[in-house]
Design a protein with these regions (language model features):
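A surface/secretory-pathway sequence property marking extracellular, secreted
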Residues: 141-153
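A surface-exposed beta-strand-loop module
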Residues: 153-176
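Catalytic core of carbohydrate-active enzymes
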Residues: 1-138, 147
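Secondary-structure transition/turn motif
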Residues: 111-118, 166-172, 182
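Sequence-structural signature of mature extracellular/luminal beta-sheet repeat domains
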Residues: 130, 148-150, 224, 237
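Hydrophobic transmembrane alpha-helix bundles
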Residues: 1-6, 168-171, 180
Length: 247
């Protein structure tokens, strides 16, 4: 576990998808396969697509970009690229690509590349991952390239509640993706997260049933926490459940 200070606003764990209210300190718990890394609402995370990486591709600017977009607030990001070899960037030999998300319009826009476009591919495939979405989002996607609506492949990841939209376009084109803000999944699936945690916890089955029954009882969170406290649970067990219930 570790203590995390969340500034004001809404935050998302980029690995678990958990949503946290800010303006407070909170103890967070992770297993050995994960670390707590958070994006603020409206965050735009850009990286090379993991499926496309090999020894040769890592030294050039990628043909495929994975862009993760977190909802509930406006966000901006500017992707900077150079030749990855020389000091040409000192003289301004680089290219930037601006990206912007509008929460009110629920629209994400990639602007045309600006600068020395010879440094990047003429065309790119963008895997746009819209985080925390309901299944209805897949039917509400509208993709435009240079103002003209186009067809784009989209896939809904039900387990992780993500909408993945794949667009191939010129790096000198403007791409816009509009969805609908009523497809943002605000809940933390508390019962599911608690079940998954308890399912792997090394405690007795009777105690698991008692804890899960309490969590699904419909009682107020403060009442649930007080009753869990009264059970004198292991400190770490109580801590994990507290994080999930109060995030």
């Amino acid at each position: 576990k570790t203590k995390v200070w969340f500034p004001e606003g809404i935050w998302y764990d980029i690995y678990t998808g958990m949503r946290y209210d800010g303006g407070r300190m909170l103890e967070v718990y992770r297993d050995l396969s994960s670390i707590p890394v958070f994006s603020k609402a409206g965050g735009i995370l850009v990286c090379a697509d993991a499926d496309e990486l090999d020894a040769r591709s890592v030294i050039k600017n990628p043909d495929v970009l994975c862009v993760r977009v977190f909802p509930e607030a406006d966000g901006e990001f500017e992707l900077y690229e150079d030749d990855n070899e020389s000091c040409g960037y000192v003289d301004g030999r680089c290219v930037t690509t601006a990206m912007k998300y509008s929460a009110d319009k629920d629209m994400f826009v990639i602007s045309p590349a600006d600068g020395d476009t010879s440094l990047i591919p003429d065309n790119r495939t963008y895997k746009l991952v819209f985080e925390r979405r309901t299944e209805a989002a897949a039917d509400k996607v509208k993709v435009s390239v240079d103002g003209k609506e186009v067809w784009a492949k989209n896939k809904y990841d039900k387990e992780n509640r993500k909408l993945i939209v794949t667009v191939n376009a010129s790096t000198e084109s403007e791409i816009s993706v509009a969805i609908s803000k009523d497809t943002v999944a605000l809940d933390n699936q508390i019962e599911k997260r608690c079940f998954d945690f308890l399912n792997q916890a090394e405690i007795g089955f009777v105690l698991k049933d008692e804890i899960y029954g309490l969590i699904t009882s419909g009682k107020k969170t403060t009442v649930i926490l007080s009753e869990l406290k009264a059970k004198e649970l292991d400190t770490e067990l109580y801590g994990v459940l507290t994080e999930i219930l109060t995030a």
